[in-house]
Amino acid sequence: MDASTINSLFLIGALLVGASILVSSLSSRLGIPILVIILAVGMVAGVDGGGIIFNNYPTAYLVGNLALAVILLDGGLRTRVASFRVALWPALSLATVGVMITTALTGLVAAWLFNLSLIQGLLIGAIVGSTDAAAVFSLLGGKGLNERVTATLEIESGSNDPMAVFLTVTLIDMIASGQTGLHWSLLGHLLREFGIGGLLGLGGGWLMLQLVNRINLAGGLYPILVVAGGLVVFSLTNALHGSGFLAVYLCGLVLGNKPIRSRHGILHMLDGMAWLAQIGMFLVLGLLVTPHDLLPIALPALGLALWMILVARPLSVVAALLPFKAFHGREKGFISWVGLRGAVPIILAVFPLMAGLPDAQLFFNLAFFIVLVSLLVQGTSLPWMAKLLKVTVPPDPAPISRSALEVHVTSEWELFVYRLGAEKWCIGAALRELKMPEGTRIAALFRNEQLLHPSGSTVLEVGDMLCVIGHEHNLPALGKLFSQAPQRGLDLRFFGDFVLEGDAELGAVAALYGLKLDGLDAKMPLAQFIRQKVGGAPVVGDQVEWHGTIWTVATMDGNKIQKVGVRFPEGTRPGPGLFL
Protein backbone atom coordinates (compact mmCIF):
# COMPACT_ATOMS: atom_id res chain seq x y z
CA MET A 1 0.00 0.00 0.00
CA ASP A 2 1.64 3.23 -1.18
CA ALA A 3 1.20 6.81 0.05
CA SER A 4 -1.34 7.63 -2.66
CA THR A 5 -3.57 4.70 -1.66
CA ILE A 6 -3.37 5.64 2.00
CA ASN A 7 -4.29 9.23 1.19
CA SER A 8 -7.25 8.02 -0.90
CA LEU A 9 -8.48 5.90 2.00
CA PHE A 10 -8.28 8.90 4.33
CA LEU A 11 -10.18 11.05 1.82
CA ILE A 12 -12.93 8.47 1.19
CA GLY A 13 -13.29 7.71 4.91
CA ALA A 14 -13.54 11.38 5.86
CA LEU A 15 -16.05 12.08 3.08
CA LEU A 16 -18.24 9.14 4.13
CA VAL A 17 -18.19 10.12 7.82
CA GLY A 18 -18.87 13.77 6.97
CA ALA A 19 -21.70 12.81 4.60
CA SER A 20 -23.25 10.59 7.29
CA ILE A 21 -23.21 13.43 9.81
CA LEU A 22 -24.66 15.98 7.37
CA VAL A 23 -27.37 13.66 6.05
CA SER A 24 -28.29 12.64 9.61
CA SER A 25 -30.04 16.02 9.97
CA LEU A 26 -32.80 14.48 7.83
CA SER A 27 -33.46 11.94 10.57
CA SER A 28 -35.75 14.13 12.67
CA ARG A 29 -37.46 15.65 9.61
CA LEU A 30 -38.29 12.32 8.00
CA GLY A 31 -38.81 10.40 11.23
CA ILE A 32 -36.24 7.81 10.14
CA PRO A 33 -33.68 6.49 12.68
CA ILE A 34 -30.25 7.97 12.11
CA LEU A 35 -28.73 4.47 12.02
CA VAL A 36 -30.78 3.64 8.90
CA ILE A 37 -29.50 6.79 7.20
CA ILE A 38 -25.89 5.88 7.99
CA LEU A 39 -26.46 2.35 6.69
CA ALA A 40 -27.95 3.85 3.53
CA VAL A 41 -24.91 6.08 3.01
CA GLY A 42 -22.68 3.00 3.20
CA MET A 43 -24.89 1.06 0.78
CA VAL A 44 -25.04 3.96 -1.72
CA ALA A 45 -21.25 4.27 -1.62
CA GLY A 46 -20.81 0.50 -2.02
CA VAL A 47 -20.53 -1.84 -4.96
CA ASP A 48 -24.01 -1.09 -6.38
CA GLY A 49 -23.65 2.68 -6.00
CA GLY A 50 -20.37 4.54 -5.72
CA GLY A 51 -18.44 1.45 -6.73
CA ILE A 52 -16.45 1.00 -3.51
CA ILE A 53 -15.76 -2.74 -3.25
CA PHE A 54 -15.42 -3.86 0.36
CA ASN A 55 -15.69 -7.56 1.20
CA ASN A 56 -13.16 -7.90 3.99
CA TYR A 57 -15.18 -9.70 6.65
CA PRO A 58 -12.39 -9.95 9.27
CA THR A 59 -11.93 -6.16 9.07
CA ALA A 60 -15.68 -5.65 9.46
CA TYR A 61 -15.61 -7.98 12.47
CA LEU A 62 -12.73 -5.98 13.98
CA VAL A 63 -14.43 -2.61 13.41
CA GLY A 64 -17.76 -3.92 14.71
CA ASN A 65 -16.31 -5.33 17.94
CA LEU A 66 -14.26 -2.20 18.63
CA ALA A 67 -17.25 0.05 18.00
CA LEU A 68 -19.60 -2.04 20.14
CA ALA A 69 -17.11 -2.05 23.01
CA VAL A 70 -16.99 1.78 22.98
CA ILE A 71 -20.80 2.07 22.66
CA LEU A 72 -21.41 -0.35 25.55
CA LEU A 73 -18.82 1.41 27.72
CA ASP A 74 -20.59 4.71 27.09
CA GLY A 75 -23.99 3.10 27.73
CA GLY A 76 -22.80 1.67 31.04
CA LEU A 77 -21.42 5.05 32.12
CA ARG A 78 -24.85 6.63 31.58
CA THR A 79 -26.93 3.88 33.22
CA ARG A 80 -27.95 4.64 36.79
CA VAL A 81 -27.74 1.75 39.26
CA ALA A 82 -30.92 3.15 40.85
CA SER A 83 -32.81 1.91 37.78
CA PHE A 84 -31.87 -1.67 38.73
CA ARG A 85 -34.46 -1.62 41.51
CA VAL A 86 -37.23 -1.83 38.93
CA ALA A 87 -35.55 -3.54 35.98
CA LEU A 88 -32.58 -5.79 36.82
CA TRP A 89 -34.28 -9.19 37.08
CA PRO A 90 -36.87 -8.56 34.34
CA ALA A 91 -34.09 -7.41 32.00
CA LEU A 92 -31.94 -10.46 32.78
CA SER A 93 -34.94 -12.70 32.14
CA LEU A 94 -35.41 -11.04 28.74
CA ALA A 95 -31.66 -11.33 28.06
CA THR A 96 -31.65 -15.11 28.66
CA VAL A 97 -35.09 -16.72 28.45
CA GLY A 98 -36.31 -14.11 25.97
CA VAL A 99 -33.38 -14.60 23.60
CA MET A 100 -33.75 -18.39 23.68
CA ILE A 101 -37.48 -18.24 22.90
CA THR A 102 -36.92 -15.70 20.10
CA THR A 103 -34.15 -17.90 18.68
CA ALA A 104 -36.34 -21.01 18.71
CA LEU A 105 -39.45 -19.39 17.20
CA THR A 106 -37.49 -17.49 14.54
CA GLY A 107 -35.35 -20.51 13.74
CA LEU A 108 -38.32 -22.80 13.12
CA VAL A 109 -39.89 -20.42 10.61
CA ALA A 110 -36.51 -19.64 8.97
CA ALA A 111 -35.88 -23.36 8.38
CA TRP A 112 -39.32 -23.71 6.76
CA LEU A 113 -39.13 -20.55 4.61
CA PHE A 114 -35.63 -21.19 3.23
CA ASN A 115 -35.69 -25.01 3.12
CA LEU A 116 -32.85 -25.33 5.63
CA SER A 117 -32.13 -27.92 8.29
CA LEU A 118 -33.50 -27.20 11.76
CA ILE A 119 -30.06 -26.46 13.18
CA GLN A 120 -29.34 -23.99 10.34
CA GLY A 121 -32.66 -22.30 11.02
CA LEU A 122 -31.82 -22.05 14.70
CA LEU A 123 -28.48 -20.47 13.75
CA ILE A 124 -30.37 -17.73 11.89
CA GLY A 125 -32.58 -17.29 14.97
CA ALA A 126 -29.53 -16.99 17.22
CA ILE A 127 -27.87 -14.44 14.93
CA VAL A 128 -30.87 -12.11 15.06
CA GLY A 129 -31.97 -13.10 18.57
CA SER A 130 -30.59 -10.20 20.61
CA THR A 131 -31.58 -6.55 20.69
CA ASP A 132 -28.85 -4.07 19.87
CA ALA A 133 -27.40 -1.66 22.45
CA ALA A 134 -26.40 0.95 19.87
CA ALA A 135 -29.91 1.05 18.39
CA VAL A 136 -31.67 1.05 21.77
CA PHE A 137 -29.46 3.72 23.39
CA SER A 138 -29.72 5.89 20.26
CA LEU A 139 -33.49 5.67 19.74
CA LEU A 140 -34.71 5.73 23.37
CA GLY A 141 -32.86 8.93 24.33
CA GLY A 142 -35.20 11.82 25.14
CA LYS A 143 -38.44 9.91 24.45
CA GLY A 144 -39.87 10.56 27.96
CA LEU A 145 -40.63 6.88 28.65
CA ASN A 146 -41.37 5.72 32.17
CA GLU A 147 -38.43 4.45 34.18
CA ARG A 148 -39.49 0.79 34.25
CA VAL A 149 -39.68 0.55 30.46
CA THR A 150 -36.52 2.55 29.75
CA ALA A 151 -34.38 0.74 32.33
CA THR A 152 -35.60 -2.70 31.25
CA LEU A 153 -34.85 -2.07 27.57
CA GLU A 154 -31.42 -0.52 28.21
CA ILE A 155 -30.25 -3.20 30.66
CA GLU A 156 -31.59 -5.94 28.37
CA SER A 157 -29.77 -4.54 25.33
CA GLY A 158 -26.54 -4.24 27.32
CA SER A 159 -26.70 -7.79 28.71
CA ASN A 160 -28.31 -10.02 26.07
CA ASP A 161 -25.34 -10.21 23.70
CA PRO A 162 -23.62 -13.01 25.70
CA MET A 163 -26.59 -15.32 25.13
CA ALA A 164 -26.77 -14.52 21.40
CA VAL A 165 -22.99 -14.93 20.95
CA PHE A 166 -23.04 -18.18 22.93
CA LEU A 167 -25.90 -19.67 20.89
CA THR A 168 -24.36 -18.53 17.60
CA VAL A 169 -20.90 -19.94 18.32
CA THR A 170 -22.35 -23.18 19.71
CA LEU A 171 -24.57 -23.78 16.68
CA ILE A 172 -21.70 -22.96 14.27
CA ASP A 173 -19.50 -25.53 16.04
CA MET A 174 -22.29 -28.11 15.86
CA ILE A 175 -22.83 -27.53 12.13
CA ALA A 176 -19.08 -27.62 11.42
CA SER A 177 -18.63 -30.90 13.34
CA GLY A 178 -21.85 -32.52 12.11
CA GLN A 179 -23.52 -32.65 15.54
CA THR A 180 -27.30 -32.64 15.73
CA GLY A 181 -27.98 -32.85 19.49
CA LEU A 182 -27.48 -30.58 22.48
CA HIS A 183 -25.43 -31.50 25.53
CA TRP A 184 -25.61 -30.42 29.17
CA SER A 185 -22.04 -29.10 28.93
CA LEU A 186 -23.45 -26.19 26.94
CA LEU A 187 -25.07 -24.86 30.12
CA GLY A 188 -21.65 -24.77 31.74
CA HIS A 189 -20.27 -22.77 28.82
CA LEU A 190 -23.12 -20.28 29.15
CA LEU A 191 -22.57 -19.85 32.89
CA ARG A 192 -18.86 -19.35 32.21
CA GLU A 193 -19.63 -16.59 29.69
CA PHE A 194 -21.81 -14.71 32.17
CA GLY A 195 -19.65 -15.49 35.22
CA ILE A 196 -16.29 -14.43 33.78
CA GLY A 197 -17.86 -11.43 32.05
CA GLY A 198 -19.59 -10.26 35.23
CA LEU A 199 -16.56 -10.81 37.47
CA LEU A 200 -14.00 -9.14 35.21
CA GLY A 201 -16.39 -6.32 34.31
CA LEU A 202 -17.09 -5.37 37.92
CA GLY A 203 -13.50 -5.98 39.02
CA GLY A 204 -12.03 -4.10 36.07
CA GLY A 205 -14.38 -1.18 36.67
CA TRP A 206 -13.33 -0.96 40.32
CA LEU A 207 -9.62 -1.05 39.41
CA MET A 208 -10.12 1.65 36.76
CA LEU A 209 -11.96 3.80 39.29
CA GLN A 210 -9.07 3.58 41.75
CA LEU A 211 -6.54 4.36 39.03
CA VAL A 212 -8.41 7.40 37.67
CA ASN A 213 -8.99 8.88 41.12
CA ARG A 214 -5.39 8.37 42.32
CA ILE A 215 -3.33 9.56 39.36
CA ASN A 216 -2.83 13.18 38.29
CA LEU A 217 -3.06 13.72 34.54
CA ALA A 218 -4.00 16.42 32.07
CA GLY A 219 -7.79 16.69 31.92
CA GLY A 220 -8.02 15.45 28.34
CA LEU A 221 -6.20 12.20 29.16
CA TYR A 222 -8.78 10.79 31.59
CA PRO A 223 -11.36 9.91 28.89
CA ILE A 224 -8.64 8.20 26.84
CA LEU A 225 -7.51 6.26 29.92
CA VAL A 226 -11.09 5.12 30.57
CA VAL A 227 -11.54 3.96 26.95
CA ALA A 228 -8.20 2.13 27.04
CA GLY A 229 -9.16 0.47 30.32
CA GLY A 230 -12.53 -0.56 28.93
CA LEU A 231 -10.90 -2.15 25.89
CA VAL A 232 -8.43 -4.00 28.13
CA VAL A 233 -11.36 -5.43 30.12
CA PHE A 234 -13.18 -6.31 26.88
CA SER A 235 -10.25 -8.09 25.23
CA LEU A 236 -9.03 -9.84 28.40
CA THR A 237 -12.50 -11.20 29.10
CA ASN A 238 -12.80 -12.51 25.54
CA ALA A 239 -9.38 -14.13 25.84
CA LEU A 240 -10.57 -15.99 28.96
CA HIS A 241 -13.73 -17.14 27.10
CA GLY A 242 -16.06 -14.80 28.94
CA SER A 243 -18.46 -12.24 27.52
CA GLY A 244 -16.48 -9.14 26.63
CA PHE A 245 -19.67 -7.24 25.78
CA LEU A 246 -21.12 -7.82 29.25
CA ALA A 247 -17.78 -7.04 30.91
CA VAL A 248 -17.24 -3.67 29.21
CA TYR A 249 -20.86 -2.65 29.95
CA LEU A 250 -20.43 -3.49 33.65
CA CYS A 251 -17.07 -1.70 33.70
CA GLY A 252 -18.80 1.46 32.49
CA LEU A 253 -21.60 0.92 34.99
CA VAL A 254 -19.16 0.91 37.91
CA LEU A 255 -17.34 4.02 36.66
CA GLY A 256 -20.57 5.90 36.00
CA ASN A 257 -22.12 5.30 39.41
CA LYS A 258 -19.19 6.21 41.67
CA PRO A 259 -17.56 9.60 42.28
CA ILE A 260 -14.85 9.82 39.62
CA ARG A 261 -12.37 12.50 38.64
CA SER A 262 -13.22 14.55 35.52
CA ARG A 263 -16.65 12.90 35.26
CA HIS A 264 -18.11 15.41 32.80
CA GLY A 265 -14.98 15.44 30.65
CA ILE A 266 -15.15 11.65 30.40
CA LEU A 267 -18.86 11.68 29.52
CA HIS A 268 -18.47 14.42 26.89
CA MET A 269 -15.53 12.68 25.24
CA LEU A 270 -17.25 9.27 25.33
CA ASP A 271 -20.37 10.77 23.77
CA GLY A 272 -18.38 11.88 20.72
CA MET A 273 -16.48 8.60 20.55
CA ALA A 274 -19.71 6.58 20.78
CA TRP A 275 -21.20 8.56 17.89
CA LEU A 276 -18.04 8.05 15.82
CA ALA A 277 -18.16 4.33 16.66
CA GLN A 278 -21.79 4.07 15.52
CA ILE A 279 -21.11 5.98 12.29
CA GLY A 280 -18.00 3.95 11.47
CA MET A 281 -19.64 0.64 12.31
CA PHE A 282 -22.83 1.19 10.28
CA LEU A 283 -20.87 2.64 7.35
CA VAL A 284 -18.67 -0.46 7.21
CA LEU A 285 -21.69 -2.76 7.49
CA GLY A 286 -23.45 -0.78 4.76
CA LEU A 287 -20.41 -1.12 2.49
CA LEU A 288 -20.20 -4.84 3.24
CA VAL A 289 -23.63 -5.72 1.86
CA THR A 290 -24.41 -6.08 -1.84
CA PRO A 291 -27.93 -4.64 -2.29
CA HIS A 292 -28.81 -6.61 -5.45
CA ASP A 293 -28.15 -9.85 -3.52
CA LEU A 294 -31.03 -8.95 -1.21
CA LEU A 295 -33.66 -8.87 -3.97
CA PRO A 296 -34.01 -12.66 -4.53
CA ILE A 297 -34.69 -13.25 -0.82
CA ALA A 298 -36.71 -10.08 -0.18
CA LEU A 299 -40.17 -11.66 0.07
CA PRO A 300 -39.39 -14.59 2.42
CA ALA A 301 -36.96 -12.42 4.39
CA LEU A 302 -39.69 -9.81 4.89
CA GLY A 303 -42.01 -12.57 6.09
CA LEU A 304 -39.38 -13.79 8.56
CA ALA A 305 -38.74 -10.24 9.82
CA LEU A 306 -42.46 -9.61 10.36
CA TRP A 307 -42.84 -12.99 12.10
CA MET A 308 -40.05 -12.06 14.49
CA ILE A 309 -41.46 -8.56 15.13
CA LEU A 310 -45.14 -9.50 15.45
CA VAL A 311 -44.99 -13.02 16.93
CA ALA A 312 -41.61 -14.24 18.19
CA ARG A 313 -40.58 -11.12 20.12
CA PRO A 314 -44.00 -10.54 21.77
CA LEU A 315 -44.29 -14.19 22.85
CA SER A 316 -40.76 -14.15 24.27
CA VAL A 317 -41.46 -10.93 26.20
CA VAL A 318 -44.72 -12.28 27.66
CA ALA A 319 -43.00 -15.50 28.74
CA ALA A 320 -39.89 -13.79 30.15
CA LEU A 321 -41.90 -11.19 32.11
CA LEU A 322 -44.53 -13.63 33.38
CA PRO A 323 -43.11 -13.72 36.96
CA PHE A 324 -42.98 -9.91 37.22
CA LYS A 325 -46.44 -8.62 38.12
CA ALA A 326 -45.49 -4.92 38.04
CA PHE A 327 -45.46 -4.93 34.22
CA HIS A 328 -48.91 -4.23 32.81
CA GLY A 329 -50.06 -5.09 29.30
CA ARG A 330 -49.17 -1.72 27.74
CA GLU A 331 -45.59 -1.90 29.02
CA LYS A 332 -45.17 -5.47 27.76
CA GLY A 333 -46.57 -4.39 24.41
CA PHE A 334 -44.09 -1.53 24.08
CA ILE A 335 -41.14 -3.67 25.20
CA SER A 336 -42.19 -6.21 22.57
CA TRP A 337 -42.22 -3.51 19.90
CA VAL A 338 -38.78 -2.16 20.83
CA GLY A 339 -36.98 -5.40 20.03
CA LEU A 340 -34.64 -3.31 17.89
CA ARG A 341 -32.03 -5.15 15.86
CA GLY A 342 -28.87 -3.32 14.86
CA ALA A 343 -25.18 -4.00 14.36
CA VAL A 344 -24.89 -7.08 16.60
CA PRO A 345 -26.86 -9.45 14.32
CA ILE A 346 -24.84 -8.30 11.28
CA ILE A 347 -21.56 -8.83 13.14
CA LEU A 348 -22.72 -12.26 14.35
CA ALA A 349 -23.63 -13.09 10.75
CA VAL A 350 -19.95 -12.64 9.87
CA PHE A 351 -19.10 -15.64 12.12
CA PRO A 352 -20.48 -18.29 9.69
CA LEU A 353 -18.66 -16.59 6.79
CA MET A 354 -15.36 -16.71 8.67
CA ALA A 355 -16.05 -20.36 9.59
CA GLY A 356 -16.71 -21.24 5.93
CA LEU A 357 -20.14 -22.77 6.55
CA PRO A 358 -22.43 -23.62 3.63
CA ASP A 359 -25.17 -21.01 3.04
CA ALA A 360 -23.17 -18.50 5.13
CA GLN A 361 -23.82 -15.70 2.61
CA LEU A 362 -27.56 -16.36 2.93
CA PHE A 363 -27.29 -16.02 6.71
CA PHE A 364 -25.50 -12.69 6.32
CA ASN A 365 -27.98 -11.29 3.80
CA LEU A 366 -30.91 -12.40 5.96
CA ALA A 367 -29.45 -10.75 9.06
CA PHE A 368 -28.89 -7.49 7.18
CA PHE A 369 -32.42 -7.53 5.73
CA ILE A 370 -33.99 -8.19 9.15
CA VAL A 371 -31.97 -5.38 10.74
CA LEU A 372 -33.07 -2.99 8.00
CA VAL A 373 -36.75 -3.92 8.44
CA SER A 374 -36.49 -3.70 12.23
CA LEU A 375 -34.98 -0.21 12.16
CA LEU A 376 -37.41 1.04 9.52
CA VAL A 377 -40.60 -0.46 10.97
CA GLN A 378 -39.94 -0.44 14.72
CA GLY A 379 -37.52 2.48 14.86
CA THR A 380 -39.62 4.94 12.88
CA SER A 381 -42.84 4.08 14.74
CA LEU A 382 -41.33 4.17 18.23
CA PRO A 383 -42.62 7.66 19.28
CA TRP A 384 -46.09 6.90 17.92
CA MET A 385 -46.17 3.51 19.67
CA ALA A 386 -45.10 5.06 22.99
CA LYS A 387 -48.04 7.48 22.85
CA LEU A 388 -50.48 4.80 21.71
CA LEU A 389 -49.54 2.47 24.58
CA LYS A 390 -49.31 5.35 27.10
CA VAL A 391 -45.86 4.54 28.48
CA THR A 392 -44.63 8.15 28.40
CA VAL A 393 -44.50 10.52 31.36
CA PRO A 394 -44.15 14.32 31.34
CA PRO A 395 -40.40 15.06 31.37
CA ASP A 396 -38.90 17.37 33.98
CA PRO A 397 -37.75 20.71 32.50
CA ALA A 398 -34.00 20.53 31.97
CA PRO A 399 -31.38 23.31 32.21
CA ILE A 400 -30.11 24.72 28.93
CA SER A 401 -26.58 23.74 29.98
CA ARG A 402 -24.74 22.06 32.84
CA SER A 403 -21.06 21.84 33.66
CA ALA A 404 -18.92 20.25 36.35
CA LEU A 405 -17.32 22.16 39.22
CA GLU A 406 -14.04 20.38 39.96
CA VAL A 407 -13.70 21.70 43.52
CA HIS A 408 -12.03 18.46 44.60
CA VAL A 409 -10.94 15.17 43.03
CA THR A 410 -14.31 13.40 43.09
CA SER A 411 -16.53 16.47 43.21
CA GLU A 412 -20.15 15.94 42.12
CA TRP A 413 -21.06 19.65 42.23
CA GLU A 414 -22.44 21.06 38.99
CA LEU A 415 -23.48 24.44 37.60
CA PHE A 416 -26.95 24.46 36.00
CA VAL A 417 -28.07 27.33 33.75
CA TYR A 418 -31.79 28.13 33.30
CA ARG A 419 -33.23 30.69 30.86
CA LEU A 420 -36.44 32.28 32.17
CA GLY A 421 -39.08 32.68 29.46
CA ALA A 422 -42.35 34.60 29.68
CA GLU A 423 -44.24 31.43 30.53
CA LYS A 424 -42.14 30.61 33.62
CA TRP A 425 -44.04 30.60 36.90
CA CYS A 426 -41.23 32.36 38.76
CA ILE A 427 -41.28 35.53 36.60
CA GLY A 428 -42.00 38.52 38.86
CA ALA A 429 -40.91 36.71 42.03
CA ALA A 430 -38.12 38.00 44.26
CA LEU A 431 -35.15 35.70 44.75
CA ARG A 432 -35.93 35.33 48.46
CA GLU A 433 -39.38 33.95 47.53
CA LEU A 434 -37.95 31.01 45.58
CA LYS A 435 -38.14 27.76 47.53
CA MET A 436 -34.77 26.44 46.45
CA PRO A 437 -34.10 22.71 47.01
CA GLU A 438 -31.90 21.96 50.00
CA GLY A 439 -28.21 22.02 49.12
CA THR A 440 -28.56 24.34 46.11
CA ARG A 441 -27.46 27.96 45.73
CA ILE A 442 -28.02 30.68 43.13
CA ALA A 443 -24.51 31.50 41.91
CA ALA A 444 -25.17 34.23 39.35
CA LEU A 445 -27.88 36.15 37.50
CA PHE A 446 -27.41 37.51 33.98
CA ARG A 447 -29.75 40.11 32.42
CA ASN A 448 -29.28 41.50 28.91
CA GLU A 449 -25.90 39.72 28.76
CA GLN A 450 -24.75 41.62 31.87
CA LEU A 451 -23.77 40.01 35.18
CA LEU A 452 -25.89 41.42 38.02
CA HIS A 453 -25.14 41.60 41.73
CA PRO A 454 -28.47 40.27 43.00
CA SER A 455 -29.91 40.48 46.48
CA GLY A 456 -32.90 38.77 48.04
CA SER A 457 -35.19 41.53 46.75
CA THR A 458 -34.07 41.21 43.11
CA VAL A 459 -37.14 40.44 40.97
CA LEU A 460 -36.80 37.93 38.15
CA GLU A 461 -37.63 39.14 34.65
CA VAL A 462 -38.24 37.55 31.27
CA GLY A 463 -34.97 36.60 29.58
CA ASP A 464 -32.94 36.32 32.79
CA MET A 465 -30.25 33.63 32.88
CA LEU A 466 -30.05 31.99 36.30
CA CYS A 467 -26.99 29.96 37.32
CA VAL A 468 -27.57 27.43 40.11
CA ILE A 469 -25.03 25.26 41.95
CA GLY A 470 -26.28 21.82 42.97
CA HIS A 471 -26.10 18.07 42.45
CA GLU A 472 -27.63 15.87 39.78
CA HIS A 473 -30.32 14.64 42.19
CA ASN A 474 -31.53 18.26 42.55
CA LEU A 475 -32.54 18.47 38.87
CA PRO A 476 -36.16 17.25 39.28
CA ALA A 477 -36.87 19.80 42.05
CA LEU A 478 -35.14 22.60 40.13
CA GLY A 479 -37.05 21.62 37.01
CA LYS A 480 -40.37 21.99 38.85
CA LEU A 481 -39.26 25.33 40.33
CA PHE A 482 -38.38 26.79 36.92
CA SER A 483 -41.11 24.97 34.99
CA GLN A 484 -43.25 26.52 32.30
CA ALA A 485 -47.00 27.07 32.60
CA PRO A 486 -47.73 24.70 29.68
CA GLN A 487 -45.54 22.10 31.37
CA ARG A 488 -47.52 22.35 34.60
CA GLY A 489 -50.74 22.04 32.59
CA LEU A 490 -49.36 18.91 30.96
CA ASP A 491 -48.53 17.50 34.39
CA LEU A 492 -52.09 18.07 35.64
CA ARG A 493 -53.62 16.52 32.52
CA PHE A 494 -51.40 13.48 32.94
CA PHE A 495 -51.43 12.98 36.70
CA GLY A 496 -55.06 13.93 37.40
CA ASP A 497 -57.36 16.50 38.99
CA PHE A 498 -55.54 16.64 42.33
CA VAL A 499 -52.12 15.69 43.67
CA LEU A 500 -51.96 14.15 47.15
CA GLU A 501 -49.08 13.50 49.51
CA GLY A 502 -47.95 9.87 49.54
CA ASP A 503 -48.02 9.69 53.34
CA ALA A 504 -51.70 10.72 53.54
CA GLU A 505 -53.66 8.04 55.42
CA LEU A 506 -56.00 5.95 53.32
CA GLY A 507 -58.89 6.47 55.74
CA ALA A 508 -58.63 10.25 55.48
CA VAL A 509 -58.47 10.12 51.68
CA ALA A 510 -61.49 7.80 51.53
CA ALA A 511 -63.49 10.08 53.84
CA LEU A 512 -62.67 13.20 51.82
CA TYR A 513 -63.71 11.68 48.51
CA GLY A 514 -66.54 9.44 49.70
CA LEU A 515 -64.77 6.16 48.91
CA LYS A 516 -65.25 2.81 50.68
CA LEU A 517 -62.26 1.15 52.35
CA ASP A 518 -63.64 -2.39 51.85
CA GLY A 519 -61.67 -3.77 54.80
CA LEU A 520 -58.45 -1.89 54.05
CA ASP A 521 -56.42 -0.51 56.96
CA ALA A 522 -57.48 3.11 57.45
CA LYS A 523 -54.01 3.96 58.82
CA MET A 524 -52.23 2.66 55.72
CA PRO A 525 -50.36 5.44 53.85
CA LEU A 526 -51.58 6.08 50.32
CA ALA A 527 -48.07 5.35 49.00
CA GLN A 528 -48.08 1.86 50.55
CA PHE A 529 -51.52 1.16 49.07
CA ILE A 530 -50.31 2.15 45.59
CA ARG A 531 -47.16 0.02 45.97
CA GLN A 532 -49.27 -3.04 46.86
CA LYS A 533 -51.56 -2.45 43.89
CA VAL A 534 -48.62 -2.07 41.48
CA GLY A 535 -47.19 -5.39 42.65
CA GLY A 536 -43.53 -4.38 42.43
CA ALA A 537 -41.17 -1.42 42.59
CA PRO A 538 -43.24 1.62 41.49
CA VAL A 539 -42.11 4.27 38.99
CA VAL A 540 -43.44 7.68 38.00
CA GLY A 541 -46.46 7.15 35.75
CA ASP A 542 -47.68 3.89 37.32
CA GLN A 543 -51.48 3.87 37.46
CA VAL A 544 -53.95 1.83 39.53
CA GLU A 545 -57.74 1.93 39.64
CA TRP A 546 -59.75 2.10 42.88
CA HIS A 547 -63.52 2.68 42.99
CA GLY A 548 -63.52 4.10 39.47
CA THR A 549 -60.78 6.65 40.21
CA ILE A 550 -57.32 6.53 38.62
CA TRP A 551 -54.36 6.94 41.00
CA THR A 552 -51.05 7.86 39.34
CA VAL A 553 -47.57 7.97 40.89
CA ALA A 554 -46.54 11.62 40.37
CA THR A 555 -43.14 11.93 42.08
CA MET A 556 -40.65 9.54 43.65
CA ASP A 557 -37.78 10.01 46.09
CA GLY A 558 -35.63 6.93 45.55
CA ASN A 559 -37.91 3.98 46.35
CA LYS A 560 -40.49 6.14 48.15
CA ILE A 561 -43.65 7.50 46.53
CA GLN A 562 -43.83 11.21 47.40
CA LYS A 563 -46.96 12.37 45.59
CA VAL A 564 -49.93 10.65 43.97
CA GLY A 565 -52.26 12.14 41.36
CA VAL A 566 -55.96 11.27 41.38
CA ARG A 567 -58.38 11.51 38.45
CA PHE A 568 -62.13 11.16 38.97
CA PRO A 569 -64.62 9.71 36.47
CA GLU A 570 -66.21 12.17 34.07
CA GLY A 571 -69.21 14.01 35.56
CA THR A 572 -68.41 13.31 39.22
CA ARG A 573 -67.90 16.03 41.81
CA PRO A 574 -65.15 15.13 44.28
CA GLY A 575 -65.02 16.31 47.87
CA PRO A 576 -62.89 19.23 49.07
CA GLY A 577 -59.65 17.34 48.39
CA LEU A 578 -56.06 17.99 49.25
CA PHE A 579 -54.65 20.08 46.41
CA LEU A 580 -50.92 20.27 47.06
From Swiss-Prot:
It is found in: Cell inner membrane. It is a multi-pass membrane protein. GO terms for molecular function: flavin adenine dinucleotide binding; potassium:proton antiporter activity. GO terms for biological process: cell volume homeostasis. PROSITE patterns: RCK_C. It catalyses: K(+)(in) + H(+)(out) = K(+)(out) + H(+)(in). The chain crosses the membrane at residues 6-26, 34-54, 57-77, 86-106, 108-128, 162-182, 193-213, 217-237, 240-260, 269-289, 292-312, 334-354, 362-382. InterPro entries: Cation/H_exchanger_TM (IPR006153), FAD-bd_PCMH-like_sf (IPR036318), FAD-bd_PCMH_sub2 (IPR016169), Na+/solute_symporter_sf (IPR038770), NhaP2 (IPR023729), RCK_C (IPR006037), RCK_C_sf (IPR036721), Transptr-assoc_dom (IPR005170). Keywords: Antiport, Cell inner membrane, Cell membrane, Ion transport, Membrane, Potassium, Potassium transport, Transmembrane, Transmembrane helix, Transport. GO terms for cellular component: plasma membrane. Residues 402-484 form the RCK C-terminal domain. Its main location: membrane. SMART domains: CorC_HlyC. Pfam families: CorC_HlyC, Na_H_Exchanger, TrkA_C. HAMAP family: NhaP2 (MF_01075). Belongs to the monovalent cation:proton antiporter 1 (CPA1) transporter (TC 2.A.36) family. NhaP2 subfamily. K(+)/H(+) antiporter that extrudes potassium in exchange for external protons and maintains the internal concentration of potassium under toxic levels. This is K(+)/H(+) antiporter NhaP2. It comes from Pseudomonas putida (strain GB-1). The gene is nhaP2.
